[in-house]
Amino acid sequence: GCPNFNQPIGSWDTSNVTSMREMFYRASSFNQPVGNWDTSKVTNMQRMFSQASSFEQDVSNWDVSGVTTMNAMFGSCTSFSNNGQSGIGNWDTSSCTNMDAMFAGTLFNQPIGSWNTSNVTTMSDMFANATGFNQNIGGWDTSAVTDMYRMFYRSAGGMTFNNGGSPSISGWNTSNVTTMREMFDGCPNFNQPIGSWDTSNVTNMLDMFRNADAFDQDLSNWNVTSVTNASNFMVGASGLSTTNYDSTLGGWSSQSVQNGVNIHFGGSQYSTATGLAYRNALVASGW
């Protein structure tokens, strides 16, 4: 890291550069306009501005069509929101496979719902601690994603994410996801109908809706047969309504679930008869 570097390098000829990995990593003073750089040959932008806490410039015009890894590109680049410009939403991200922690810990809140994410395999920590992010990303192709660990996480709570108020996130293809651990942990506003998600390959749901107070959806259609860890699933949250809780317990109790799984539904209350029967069936299966 070069914490004092802040020179005007916006006119550099970068037309043959293939990697910008960690270029401004920990360059906490850097905040120069580099939006006109030719990035057409760049394939790696891993941690490019990570911890460059002063950087807040418009990079909308960058050609990122060849970039395969963007993990932690702006991670902990705390001031970054593309200088308030929405053009970053036009980036061609079709080659990217890794978006891990891309906007973690930033002020970023730009409309990126049209990004091509068809080749992305990991979105873990992508918006973790990005407290202001609340855009509609329901149109993303998540069919290749395997890891959504802590995607919208903040341990202290206060995340504003609710998919921009749109239920479109219900259409995400999550058939290849194996971990949703802490995915919405600390998202008090999130409450979208995601009951149709394919969770058949998910093994880890630990803390998934921890402190997600607003979340109240019917999850009865979720396939939880692969889940081995669901500890503190909704701990600290208000929980589901009796209707949704009964329905969820009913759908899950009819499945051949793994033995020895602990789960916490926060403040959820089942009905005296029906819900209790479903609960007992799950307990009998080792939950």
Predicted regions: what they are:
Residues 1-287:
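Negatively charged
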